[in-house]
């Protein structure tokens, strides 16, 4: 690393999205890039990988293929180099094991000389006269500074933990740390999981599998009206497309918030086949005796109170509008993830655009400032739709970021792939006509 060199891109955080950006910029000689992450090595959700768990999207949604299928860092090339391509073919599943996806990403990161771990970005300053950013990085060997024209934020998200759940590190943990604590969980008399998404489902299934050997009471609650599966119909999957992303971005802010609030089944549910596996396991376990387990929808965690050897958990059931208590020795939170603005951005906070609700405002090209020099990954469900955290759309976003920075289309970006249309054309829209006569609505409900 040359501290006097001016980079075109400094990436902050190395998750799948910024790692994909590093892979896609690697063949481009006109771009000088460097990426920093505070972790010791690439590690993507390894704390919640029960054996056999898979991604919920096909293998083609790897780091590079949707932008450049010929790229050396494709998953298929990884399999070929590791002599696993035929085995993957014979397995006959499009869905990658999560553990294998993690190994694939580690392999890609290790090939890239411009990706640096154990590198904590402390501060970012902007020199307006030079129109350059100075990034201060703390590494084991000391502090260094790098200068760049553009920043790409890829610091990722953190598990959601309600304030009233904080302060109980021995009894309340995030689903992200499940495997680290599993041995301890198996010694408890009662375990409660809160959260009805894929993570909560996988943990419930894993603990249910061993309930006979250990005899604990296993509770699984969600505030959702039911334990619902994701809608993965092919026409629904067209919503994970450039077409729908553009349409969603064109809506006004309040309408986008309203729409995203109605789309939980598109991205927050459980894979249908996994829902069925849970039911089949419950059926199998109940053959000879009742199972010490409870599953309850419509129940929002409201409060936590610590007793001598257990927690008193207060829930509110939305159907009957009443609160009730459960006792549990441990609580596993599977409530999803949220974005937190890195402290290193504080000196340049005034350069960032914000919407009317105090959220980072993204331009269509995923930049967050007027000069289109600060870009953000994995932010903006409220502006670009529910596909923002989707691994399958990472290449689309990275292609747009690269094309914007270079000012030309290096990676072609598809604009229309869906068979369906998400809005009428401008020419088809009827202009309202003022009239004093009575009008009769012909709006249909289907």
From Swiss-Prot:
Keyword terms, alphabetized: FAD, Flavoprotein, Monooxygenase, NADP, Oxidoreductase
Binding positions for NADP(+) per the UniProt entry: 54, 56, 98, 199, 223, 267, 301
Catalytic activity: putrescine + NADPH + O2 = N-hydroxyputrescine + NADP(+) + H2O
Example GO molecular function: monooxygenase activity
Top EC class, one word: oxidoreductase
Residues bound to FAD: 17, 37-39, 44-45, 56, 121, 378, 389, 391
Pathway where it operates: Siderophore biosynthesis
Swiss-Prot/TrEMBL GO biological process terms: biosynthetic process
Tagged with keyword NADP: yes
Top-rank taxon: Bacteria
Family of this protein: Belongs to the lysine N(6)-hydroxylase/L-ornithine N(5)-oxygenase family.
Recorded domain comment: Contains an N-terminal Rossmann-like domain that binds FAD and a C-terminal domain that binds NADP(+). The smaller third domain consists of three alpha-helices (residues 70-114) and is involved in oligomerization.
PANTHER family, alphabetized: L-ORNITHINE N(5)-MONOOXYGENASE (PTHR42802:SF1), MONOOXYGENASE (PTHR42802)
Record function comment: N-hydroxylating monooxygenase involved in the biosynthesis of fimsbactin A, the major siderophore produced by A.baumannii. Catalyzes the N-hydroxylation of the aliphatic diamine putrescine into N-hydroxyputrescine (NHP). Putrescine is the preferred substrate, but the enzyme can also catalyze the N-hydroxylation of cadaverine, with 4-fold lower catalytic efficiency. Cannot use lysine or ornithine as substrates. Uses both NADPH and NADH as the reducing cofactor with a preference for NADPH.
Subunit structure: Homotetramer.
Protein name (record): Putrescine N-hydroxylase
Organism: Acinetobacter baumannii (strain ATCC 17978 / DSM 105126 / CIP 53.77 / LMG 1025 / NCDC KC755 / 5377)
Gene: fbsI
């Amino acid at each position: 690393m040359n501290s006097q060199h001016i980079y075109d891109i400094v990436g902050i955080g190395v998750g799948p999205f910024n790692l994909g950006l590093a892979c896609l910029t690697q063949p481009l000689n006109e771009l000088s890039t460097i990426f920093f992450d505070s972790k010791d090595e690439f590690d993507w959700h390894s704390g919640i990988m029960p054996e056999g768990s898979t991604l919920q999207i096909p293998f083609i949604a790897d780091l590079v293929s949707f932008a450049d299928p010929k790229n050396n860092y494709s998953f298929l090339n990884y399999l070929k180099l590791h002599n696993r391509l035929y085995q993957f073919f014979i397995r006959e599943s499009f869905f990658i094991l999560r553990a294998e996806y993690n190994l694939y990403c580690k392999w890609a990161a290790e090939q890239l000389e411009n990706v640096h771990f154990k590198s904590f970005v402390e501060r970012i300053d902007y020199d307006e006269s030079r129109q350059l950013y100075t990034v201060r990085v703390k590494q084991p060997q000391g502090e260094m500074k790098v200068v760049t024209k553009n920043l790409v934020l890829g610091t990722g998200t953190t598990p959601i933990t309600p304030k009233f759940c904080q302060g109980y590190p021995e009894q309340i943990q995030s689903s992200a740390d499940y495997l680290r604590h599993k041995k301890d969980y198996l010694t408890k008399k009662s375990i409660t999981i809160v959260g009805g998404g894929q993570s909560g489902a996988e943990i419930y299934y894993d603990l249910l599998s061993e309930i006979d050997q250990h005899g604990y009471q296993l509770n699984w609650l969600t505030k959702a009206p039911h334990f619902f599966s994701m809608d993965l119909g092919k026409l629904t999957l067209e919503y994970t497309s450039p077409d729908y992303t553009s349409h969603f971005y064109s809506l006004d802010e309040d309408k986008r918030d309203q729409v995203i609030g109605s789309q939980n089944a598109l991205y927050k549910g459980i894979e249908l086949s996994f829902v069925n596996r849970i039911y089949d396991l419950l059926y199998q376990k109940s053959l000879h005796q009742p199972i010490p387990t409870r599953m309850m929808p419509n129940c929002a965690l409201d409060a936590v109170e610590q007793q001598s050897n257990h927690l008193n958990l207060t829930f509110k059931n939305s159907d009957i509008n009443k609160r009730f208590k459960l006792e549990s020795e441990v609580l596993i939170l599977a409530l999803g993830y949220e974005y937190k603005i890195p402290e290193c951005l504080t000196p340049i906070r005034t350069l960032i655009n914000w919407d009317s609700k105090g959220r980072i405002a993204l331009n269509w090209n995923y930049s967050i400032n007027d000069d289109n020099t600060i870009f953000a990954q994995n932010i903006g469900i409220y502006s670009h739709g529910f596909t923002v955290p989707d691994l399958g759309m990472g290449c689309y976003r990275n292609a747009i970021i690269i094309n914007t920075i270079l000012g030309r289309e290096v990676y072609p970006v598809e604009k229309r792939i869906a068979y369906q249309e998400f809005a009428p054309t401008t020419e088809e829209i009827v202009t309202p006509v003022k009239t004093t006569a009575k009008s009769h609505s012909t709006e249909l409900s289907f």
